[in-house]
């Protein structure tokens, strides 16, 4: 039985997309999806070649956003809705990089999950 070859899903003329930014203390991950939820592209600081503690820096998050912004402008995207999640240091850097690249930000949401006294938090660091 022959397998059907799947073609890469090419979305042209997408005006508005949603950028899901997950910023942890160790890395920054950004996924670009349509408003329906179909993921168009994604990358992270680790995928760009940063290793160790450099992945969690604001500079690495800026580079991630710049790479995706260049690809989005190539697809014809003009407006971005941004969903921020997590406590990392790359949150503000991603938003600033998307604005400076020429993309308009229509909605800026913080979707960080907040527990109502759920699991026990990790112990505090003693340095």
Positions of PLM-derived features:
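Ribosome-associated RNA-binding proteins
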Residues: 1-127
């Amino acid at each position: 039985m022959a397998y059907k070859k799947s073609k890469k899903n090419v979305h042209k003329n997408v005006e508005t997309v949603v950028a899901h930014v997950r910023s942890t203390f160790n890395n920054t991950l950004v996924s670009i999806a349509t408003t329906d939820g179909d993921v168009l592209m994604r990358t992270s600081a680790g995928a760009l070649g940063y290793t160790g503690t450099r992945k969690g820096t604001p500079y690495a998050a800026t580079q991630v956003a710049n790479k995706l912004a260049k690809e989005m402008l190539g697809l014809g995207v003009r407006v971005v809705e941004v969903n921020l999640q997590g406590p990392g240091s790359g949150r503000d850097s991603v938003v600033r990089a998307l604005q400076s690249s020429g993309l308009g930000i229509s909605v800026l949401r913080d979707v960080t999950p907040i527990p109502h006294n759920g699991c026990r938090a990790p112990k505090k660091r003693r340095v």
